[in-house]
UniProtKB/Swiss-Prot annotation:
Protein name according to UniProt: Zinc finger E-box-binding homeobox 1
A GO molecular-function descriptor: DNA-binding transcription repressor activity, RNA polymerase II-specific
DNA-binding residues (ranges): 559-618
Chain ranges of zinc fingers (C2H2-type): 150-173, 180-202, 220-242, 248-272, 882-904, 910-932, 938-959
Cross-link (Glycyl lysine isopeptide (Lys-Gly) (interchain with G-Cter in SUMO)): 327, 752
Cell location: Nucleus
Induction annotation: Induced during Neurod2-induced neurogenesis.
UniProt feature, compositional bias: Basic and acidic residues: 484-501
Record PTM Phosphoserine, positions in chain: 31, 33, 293, 302, 657, 664, 671, 678, 682
Family that this chain belongs to: Belongs to the delta-EF1/ZFH-1 C2H2-type zinc-finger family.
GO biological process, one term: regulation of T cell differentiation in thymus
GO cellular component entries: cytosol; nucleoplasm; nucleus
PANTHER family on file: HISTONE H4 TRANSCRIPTION FACTOR-RELATED, ZINC FINGER E-BOX-BINDING HOMEOBOX 1
């Protein structure tokens, strides 16, 4: 029996009985060893096994041209029809018919010899085209020309020899107690897993494509299409295909994606980067949403309860952002102007969630702008996040009596107008207290895991809003360009009844940067608010406004520049630099001094003190919570001059250094300024530290910090402000304070500060760092709040304040609860500062801030664990559910909420300890770790190849019909067994060579398989690229919903295993390396073998020559 070439079978569509008179004359195309019967391998994965098996049709209903074997009732439907018709309704015969025909047939076939009974066939050839014999295939999909000769009566599978048919019936159709039978057809299996895989053949082609060996483990099934997934988040992303939801939008080309993997790959490809306009991204043509929220309280006596999770119609879901996108995207979006429309209810139509008024900031028709809710732009991380500014207002009310935010968030227009009439109209600054949100930045994930957003707003006159330059791309504080030094004096101060009590009590505190600034203020029990009926002259400021004569513009000996950042930030930066390099060189010191805007000598002295251990990790002047102290940081030895209400001219000479006041009941600072200033303003954060003091309530007016001030003013508030703020508030301060000249954003950080060492506040007290509002961005940090605002969620740990990171003057932050988004803001041309390299957004630096002194938390410690988050980080709803602060999703478990947060932050918390790769989900890390351990739990039952990753295995199983082959050894063994004893001598003769060559042959087969996989991956990538290009040409929205669904499904299939493909690539590299080593070893072995053979041949030749010589000598003798 001669074997022809493999896979070269001759197609004989309709063999006749007279054509096959001699069975042995037929040229066999292949041996039956390819059938998996003897190896107990599932057949249905190569063909359908006639799974439809239209149960035991009566013989009279059989087609006339059917080939029938004894005792068998054949089926009418063929394998080809099974695939085309996707399982007909009358698939299987009844169990009774199976029982009638089953056992006797098995017995008969098993007892028969190799004599086949072949019945004549009808001559009609047309009717044979659909029969299973004519269309049956072997396991590789090749048509079997001889399948009609010996057909299984149960499954219509054809065989060339009767022994193969007997084996097939024995292993597939003989029932016993140990076997597992298919309920839809008569197949039996030795293992349950084989039966489960066989059941997939009864499914439609669409469903079968997604079912792999682990199909039994896919418990999350789609109710729409029947797809099943192993993990719930894969099902959630898949469901977006049916719902049409596309929460991920490319910020450049505005293409939207339903799957995060598709979005990430689109962003990383950067194909659409050239489509971005030069001066910002237009938002035209996109869907507009309506943003509305309840009106804010018009008086501090009725604060609105914060409701962070306010639902906004048509608000898309959140989206994660890739690390690269987080680093690069925000730069030019941050400067997009946003003008807030006015109105009591503020139902401002948004273009895709952005208050937009074109390239230039314009004043609205109303004299007072009102903001109730801000929807962050649909860029990258959020899409969009709704920030209810009333929540921020209520938080700030606790800290600063609500006056700062009321300037922007006051909703009662009538109340504003009446108060404006009461105010003195001599100052034109008071007339146009218009609030403009200049920019809302893109969220950014910081290196410690927190995410940060900036909301920039300014209080400007409508006339000034018109002169803002058009080029906002490089100027974040857009209104700052119009802020000149000719501002009229602020009429806003808060007078105290006991002014003298402040004047004599500044003697026991020192500056944090130097040791020359004494000062301590005794607390005042109550406040006297500014009377709006006062004349328009600069009123006498409160004693707390005393500042040293260290202004860089007025006093020549001032060491602090006008662009001096806040004191706390300076210390944080210096300590960060010190942590990086404790002994910097002179050049490095000069760079550090430039970055923090301090004199080189001062920085040098500070480093020397740190090296000498003179500067502890905490503030050098920790006053007790009940006592007040004033820290006036300055580099001069001059004593601050007390402010006199009758000497307004002294205000121009007052220093612009930080005034840090820590006292329980403390008066706000209010100082008047002469109208003409010789220099532009500089950042002057106002630091308010809330302290627990039963003595009374201290009100801090936003107007307290005036234009000439440069340094932070730290005031402390008592714990009882929530109750007392209703009684004691500065009613008209918000009108008079227009800080249009200041360069530093308002920094409001209300963080859970258990042992905050810099501010020296008692445990569990919220610390509020308030920088007076300016025309520049305002930074608000609200990670933790007091018990008065239970709905604001804490992000800080007990001993850390992540929002109080070291931020230079050009770093802007607003920390929304559980989110912290930071940006490097471009400073005004008047005050240019080099960017600080210590804190790079989402940077890869390994250094951390000094957590003991600066309260910087390592948020990874909290977020990286899969355990339940701390109670401070989560808040339960009334039903005991866990709600996300940034979107409307609610979760039953806190761990689910924690993992959901990764979608907002883009963080990958599960990191491999060997190669440092990070993954969002833990099971992805587990599969990745198998690469390092070498574990390969998944094995193909057809070719025997093993896989360490389920995605690689699934891909192999789904596409193996075209290339999956048994190993070379198995194939040779099966062919030798079929060939019989006549080829045994040849096998024995070539056994040694074959054993030596088989490893290389196996390696070549593996390389071929790997090459096929790589080719398929490259083809997939090319197809995906073609699809994306076609979609870009077709437009933003696909008009064909069906095509879009298919496209999204393909994208989902492609991206569902995005991280898995990374692991596959690593696995392929490992295999390639192993194969290379194996090939080298085989080659070396072959070379060594050839050398041995040559040596043996030479020895044999020498021996033969010696024998010949000996024989010749013998003959001669």
């Amino acid at each position: 029996m001669a074997d022809g070439p493999r896979c070269k079978r001759r197609k004989q569509a309709n063999p006749r009985r007279n054509n096959v008179t001699n069975y042995n004359t037929v040229v066999e195309a292949n041996s039956d060893s390819d059938d998996e019967d003897k190896l107990h391998i599932v057949e249905e994965e190569s063909i359908t096994d006639a799974a439809d098996c239209e149960g035991g049709m009566p013989d009279d209903e059989l087609p006339a041209d059917q080939t029938v074997l004894p005792g068998g009732s054949d089926r009418g439907g063929g394998a080809k029809n099974c695939w085309q018709d996707n399982v007909k309704d009358n698939e299987c015969d009844s169990d009774a018919e199976n029982e009638q025909n089953h056992d006797p047939n098995v017995e008969e076939f098993l007892q028969q010899q190799d004599t086949a009974v072949i019945y004549p066939e009808a001559p009609e050839e047309d009717q044979r085209q659909g029969t299973p014999e004519a269309s049956s295939h072997d396991e590789n999909g090749t048509p079997d020309a001889f399948s009609q000769l010996l057909t299984c009566p149960y499954c219509d599978r054809g065989y060339k020899r009767f022994t193969s048919l007997k084996e097939h019936i024995k292993y597939r159709h003989e029932k016993n107690e140990d076997n597992f039978s298919c309920s839809l057809c008569s197949y039996t299996f030795a293992y349950r897993t084989q039966l489960e895989r066989h059941m997939t053949s009864h499914k439609s082609g669409r469903e079968q494509r997604h079912v792999t060996q682990s199909g039994g483990n896919r418990k999350f099934k789609c109710t729409e299409c029947g797809k099943a997934f192993k993990y719930k988040h894969h099902l959630k992303e898949h469901l977006r295909i049916h719902s049409g939801e596309k929460p991920y939008e490319c910020p450049n080309c505005k293409k939207r994606f339903s799957h995060s993997g598709s979005y990430s790959s689109h962003i990383s490809s950067k194909k659409c980067i050239s489509l971005m306009p030069v001066n910002g991204r237009p938002r035209s043509g996109l869907k507009t949403s309506q943003c509305s929220s309840p009106s804010l309280s018009t008086s501090p006596g009725s604060p609105t309860r914060p409701q962070i999770r306010q639902k906004i119609e048509n608000k898309p879901l959140q989206e994660p952002l890739s690390v690269n996108q987080i680093k690069t995207e925000p730069v030019d979006y941050e400067f997009k102007p946003i003008v807030v429309a006015s109105g009591i209810n503020c139902s401002t139509p948004l273009q895709n969630g952005v208050f937009s008024s074109g390239g230039q900031l314009q004043a609205t028709s109303s004299p007072q702008g009102v903001v109730q809710a801000v929807v962050l732009p649909t860029v990258g991380l959020v899409s969009p996040i709704s920030i209810n500014l009333s929540d921020i207002q209520n938080v700030l009310k606790v800290a600063v009596d609500g006056n700062v935010i009321r300037q922007v968030l006051e909703t009662n227009q009538a109340s504003l107008a009446s108060k404006e009439q009461e105010a003195v109209s001599a100052s034109p600054i008071q007339q146009g207290g218009h609030s403009v949100i200049s920019a809302i930045s893109l969220p950014l994930v910081d290196q410690d895991g927190t995410t940060k957003i900036i909301i920039n707003y300014s209080l400007e006159q409508p006339s000034q809003l018109q002169v803002v330059p058009q080029n906002l791309k490089k100027e974040i504080p857009a209104p700052t360009n119009s802020c000149k030094s000719e501002k009229l004096p602020e009429d806003l101060t808060v007078k105290s009844e006991t002014d003298k009590s402040f004047e004599g009590a500044r003697d026991d505190s020192t500056c944090l940067l130097c040791e020359d600034c004494p000062g301590d203020l005794n607390a005042l029990p109550e406040l006297k608010h500014y009377d709006p009926e006062c004349p328009a002259q600069p009123p006498p400021p409160a004693p707390a406004t005393e500042k040293p004569e260290s202004s860089a513009s007025s006093a020549g000996n001032g060491d602090l520049s006008p662009s001096q950042p806040p004191l706390k930030n300076l210390l944080s930066l210096l300590k960060a630099y010190y942590a990086l390099n404790a002994q910097p060189s002179t050049e490095e010191l000069s760079k550090i001094a430039d970055s923090v805007n301090l004199p080189l000598d001062g920085v040098k002295k500070w480093f020397e003190k740190m090296q000498a251990g003179q500067i502890p990790g905490q503030s050098p002047d920790p006053p007790s919570p009940g006592t007040g102290s004033v820290n006036i940081p300055t580099k001069t030895d001059e004593q601050p001059q007390p402010a006199d209400g009758n000497e307004p001219q002294e205000d121009s000479t007052r220093g612009q250094s930080p005034v840090k006041i820590r006292s329980s009941p403390v008066l706000p600072v209010g100082s008047a300024m002469n109208g003409s200033r010789s220099c532009t303003s500089s950042p002057s954060p106002l630091n308010l530290c809330s302290a627990r003091n039963p003595q009374g309530y201290s009100c801090v007016a936003e107007g307290a910090q005036e234009e000439p001030q440069v340094e932070p003013l730290d005031l402390s508030l008592p714990k009882q402000q929530g109750e007392l703020l209703e009684r004691s508030t500065v009613s008209s301060v918000y009108q008079n304070s227009v800080y249009s000249v200041q360069e530093e954003p308002l920094n409001l950080s209300c963080a859970k500060k258990e042992p905050q060492k810099d501010s020296c506040v008692t445990d569990s007290e919220p610390v509020v760092n308030v920088v007076p509002p300016s025309a520049n961005p305002i930074n608000i940090a609200i990670p933790t709040v007091t018990a008065q605002l239970p709905t604001i969620v804490a992000i800080a740990d007990q001993n850390s304040v992540p929002c109080l990171r070291a931020l230079a003057a050009n770093k802007q932050t607003i920390l929304i609860p559980q989110v912290a988004y930071t940006y490097s803001a471009t400073v005004s041309p008047a005050v240019q500062e080099p960017p600080v390299k210590v804190i790079q957004p989402n940077g890869n630096q390994d250094e951390r801030q000094d957590t003991s002194s600066e309260g910087v938390s390592t948020v990874e410690d909290q977020n990286d664990s899969d355990s339940t988050p701390p109670k401070k980080k989560t808040r339960k709803t009334e039903n005991g559910m866990y709600a996300c602060d940034l979107c409307d999703k609610i979760f039953q478990k806190s761990s689910s909420l924690l993992r959901h947060k990764y979608e907002h932050t883009g963080k990958r918390p599960h990191e491999c300890g060997i190669c440092r790769k990070a993954f969002k989900h833990k099971h992805h890390l587990i599969e990745h770790m198998r690469l390092h351990s070498g574990e390969k739990p998944y094995q193909c039952d057809k070719c025997g190849k093993r896989f360490s990753h389920s995605g690689s295995y699934s891909q192999h199983m789904n596409h193996r019909y075209s290339y999956c082959k048994r190993g070379a050894e198995d194939r040779d063994a099966m062919e030798q067994e079929d060939a019989g004893p006549e080829v045994l001598p040849e096998v024995l003769a070539t056994e040694h060579v074959g054993a030596r060559a088989s490893p290389s042959q196996a390696d070549s087969d593996e390389r071929e398989s790997l090459t096929r996989e790589e080719d398929e991956d490259s083809e997939k990538e090319e197809e995906e690229e073609d699809k994306e290009m076609e979609e870009l040409q077709e437009g933003k929205e696909c008009e064909n919903p069906q095509g879009e669904e298919e496209e999204e499904e393909e994208e989902e299939e492609e991206e569902e295993e995005e991280e898995e493909e990374e692991v596959e690539a690593d696995e392929a590299e490992h295999e390639a390396a192993a194969k290379t080593d194996g090939t080298v070893e085989v080659g070396a072995a072959q070379q060594a073998g050839s050398l041995e053979q040559k040596a043996s041949e030479s020895e044999m030749e020498s021996e033969s020559e010696s024998e010949q010589l000996s024989e010749e000598k013998t003959n001669e003798a």
